[in-house]
A protein has these predicted regions:
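Transmembrane beta-barrel strands of outer-membrane/channel proteins
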Residues: 43-49, 93-99, 159-165, 226-230, ...
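Hydrophobic, lipid-facing positions within transmembrane beta-strands of outer-membrane proteins
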Residues: 39-41, 71-77, 139-145, 208-212, ...
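Repeated loop/turn-to-beta-strand initiation elements of outer-membrane beta-barrel proteins
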Residues: 87-91, 154-157, 220-226
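Outer-membrane beta-barrel "beta-signal"
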Residues: 216-220, 247-260
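Short glycine/proline- and aromatic-enriched beta-strand/turn motifs that initiate or cap beta-hairpins
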Residues: 19-87, 231, 259
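A hydrophobic membrane-anchoring alpha-helix module
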Residues: 215-217, 221-233
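Bacterial Sec-dependent N-terminal signal peptides
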Residues: 1-24, 39, 44, 147-149, ...
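Extracellular/periplasm-exposed beta-strand and loop segments of Gram-negative cell-envelope proteins
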Residues: 51-70, 100-139, 166-207, 211, ...
Length: 260
């Protein structure tokens, strides 16, 4: 009996290894079948650089004192299918996880805002003149739907809409070294040392926009891309009153892709 058990234990690793090899072969076969039907699978990662900005810049924002991009990254998988005999045109569908963030410091005048006074005296609301610090850090699941065009075997351009769901997000900051007028620019003036705001819970969950870019196939299994994504709806709902102008996420992405 002991010999039988010992034999089974010795055979178990071989069975697991064989099963693993079969799974790898099945995965390879599935990828090959997809490629034969015109679909080419890719995995990629990259870095986002940009910001969340009103367009055009409103008169209330007098000067951008500083801008600090966040450590923003993206990971994605996509499938690409080319059409026609010459394989010039194609369709690319993907799913990516991405972060978009920044920090800014600005000088503003008559900037409508609502914040909590750091001295404990309560909420201040009205037209703010002074300094404003803002921190934005949002994470999204994004589906791009892109048309592609190949100039040759190495160069490709792509463009189309994208649709995003915000997994979690932060929009917070502080107003300092200034004063606020009650409700409007001609209201009662109150000096404020520092006040904080946090509108993270008011961020819009669903966003959409356009993406356009180019890609260079450096090696058989490696390509490098540069893309621009431009949000077409603001990060806050249209009825949000604490920020009176729309803020759009505008980011450039440097990406690297492994082509199966």
């Amino acid at each position: 009996m002991k010999k039988i058990i010992l034999s089974l234990l010795l055979l178990l690793p071989l069975s697991v290894a064989a099963h693993t090899n079969d799974e790898v072969k099945d995965t390879d076969n599935n990828l090959l079948k997809a490629a034969l039907k015109g679909w080419h699978v890719r995995l990629g990662a990259g870095f986002n650089l940009g910001g969340t900005s009103p367009l055009p810049l409103p008169a209330e924002i007098r000067k951008i004192e500083s801008y600090q991009p966040g450590l923003c990254f993206t990971v994605q998988g996509a499938a690409h299918k080319q059409f026609g005999e010459k394989k010039k045109w194609g369709l690319m569908l993907g799913l990516r996880f991405e972060s978009k963030g920044m920090k800014t410091d600005a000088t503003v005048k008559n900037y409508h805002m609502e914040a909590v006074n750091d001295d404990g005296s309560g909420t201040v609301r009205g037209a703010w003149t002074g300094k404003v610090k803002t921190e934005v850090n949002n994470n999204y699941l994004t589906i791009p739907v892109l048309a592609t065009y190949n100039f040759n075997e190495r160069w490709m351009v792509k463009a189309g809409p994208y649709f995003s769901y915000m997994v979690n997000g932060t929009f917070k900051g502080s107003a300092y070294d200034g004063y606020i007028r009650d409700q409007e620019p001609t209201g009662t003036k109150t000096e404020v040392q520092s006040a904080s705001y946090d509108f993270s819970d008011d961020l819009r969950r669903f966003q959409w926009g356009v993406q356009a870019g180019g890609e260079f196939k450096a090696y058989k299994h490696l390509s490098v891309s540069l893309d621009l994504t431009w949000g077409l709806n603001g990060i806050f709902p249209s009825d949000f009153q604490s920020v009176t102008f729309a803020l759009y996420p505008i980011y450039g992405t440097l990406g690297f892709h492994y082509l199966f």
